[in-house]
Amino acid sequence: MTKQQTSVMRNASIAKEEREGSDNNNVDRSSSDAISDNDAERSNSHSEIDNESNFDMVPYSRFSHKQKMLLVVQCAFTGFFSTVAGSIYYPVLTIIERKFNITEELANVTIVVYFIFQGVAPSIMGGLADTFGRRPIVLWAILAYFCACIGLACAHNYAQILALRCLQAAGISPVIAINSGIMGDVTTKVERGGYVGLVAGFQVVGTAFGALIGAGLSSKWGWRAIFWFLAIGSGICLVFSTLLMPETKRTLVGNGSVTPRSFLNRSLILHVGSVKKTLHLDDPDPETLEPRTSVDFLAPLKILHIREIDILLSIAGLQFSTWTTHQTALTIVLSKKYNLSVAKIGLCFLPAGISTLTSIISAGRYLNWSYRTRKVKYNRWIKEQELQLMEKYKGDKNKVAELIHSNSHYAFNLVEARLHPAFVTLLLSSIGFTAFGWCISVKTPLAAVLCTSAFASLFSNCILTFSTTLIVDLFPSKASTATGCLNLFRCLLSAIFIAALTKMVEKMRYGGVFTFLSAITSSSSLLLFYLLKNGKQLSFDRIRANDKSAGRSVGKNSEKVST
């Protein structure tokens, strides 16, 4: 049987979700962008094929639904240790303050430095993952984190705590950005929102319930127990990742069917018969390999040079930093105003944790539904437009294709599909945070504090799912680098707000602080209207500029289809 015959037979079993929203007679209008002239990640901005490569009869990804779900579990497991390391520390903040005889501001610095390194590291390591592959960078990250946690568990002074918190954050934080890259490697736009939502949802379990875990461990065995817990857990994660995590970077493995050359990128799971059969490792699709790119440490700056991306990152960053400031304030207030024990403080994070988990997973599922619905309507509309143009130009297909390719009016509005519900969620969370601030300021009953915290958390992190999914859509081959920029914004803004929290409370009280933060966040959300109105045109113009600078005719070249 020839390779062509085998390919035809394989395509008879392509999953329905990998065909949904596609139409081989039309051309995609995804607002994807390249961050440099030589980047091969430009999408074919005018192909109706949302989910497959340019090569006929070859699926975009060989990973089955079950294998994608296993990747979700793998990403969530590693991502959990990145998110939990921040929140698990909150219940012992006042204990650290007393243990090392430091001020509240110095205790907050241990959180600030964590966020600084959590923001900076992914911007660097994400670029390495986009070049050398996801697997080796993830393994290095877990190993560095594992060593830092052991050091923290054995620390004897404040300086050691501070330095090792920096290493801990720098080590593990890149996995959040890399996880987005992994999902971009193996999923299509029509299904991506759900998978990204699942990964983000399970990752946020660490943030949502870390304080509860930390309170339970520290109240039973002392503050060092939280770091021993992280060391043991990350050690187990390192073993499983070494054995089971496959490489997904499309420059190295294509659609998953190509065996990577370097042993660092090869997992033992590739030797399992069922995996070899599903991925077609014995009958690969080398044509799906994307061109290799060199390491570009300036890639984040190129992404940050894009106006609409800056707006999106600012909005998401301000929202996340308000949420993390609320967590820090909750810890301090429950300990010093409400005089609760460490164990009870942990329990008080449960309502916000459940709300956060619910919101992120629900947001991902909503994005899938929204994308499919809008894409179906768009498909009908563009077919009608093509028929009208064919009549107008008397059946000149080339003329019609050129007109559609060169006019943004006919482009699918991916920005609107991903961001249209964001304004409502941002507004509701701002109301919740304002109410939370005044509740703790006047010391209302604890139930009111926890209810406002839960309400604000229910809507505050939706923007992370929306923005992460859109960023992966726009930069499928640089997803780790692009998502690292999101981490940079949200973590550095969090560091600034938390560092200033004590001083702001002295001047404005908690009510004034959260009214101020909510006002900034809700004001920034007005920029969403600019994105929703102009995002499609801005992305379209940027693609034209990049194509012209590379000497290509817009939409008429064999560029890679955005996933």
Curated annotation (Swiss-Prot):
List the InterPro entries.
MFS, MFS_dom, MFS_trans_sf
The stretches that face the Extracellular side, renumbered to this chain, are 97-108, 157-165, 217-224, 318-341, 443-445, 503-511
What Pfam families is this protein classified in? MFS_1
UniProt entry tagged with the keyword Transferase: no
Its membrane topology: Multi-pass membrane protein
Q: What biological function has been recorded for the protein in this entry?
A: Multidrug resistance transporter involved in resistance and adaptation to quinidine and ketoconazole.
Protein name per UniProt: Quinidine resistance protein 1
Which lineage do the record's taxonomy fields give for this organism?
Answer: Eukaryota, Fungi, Dikarya, Ascomycota, Saccharomycotina
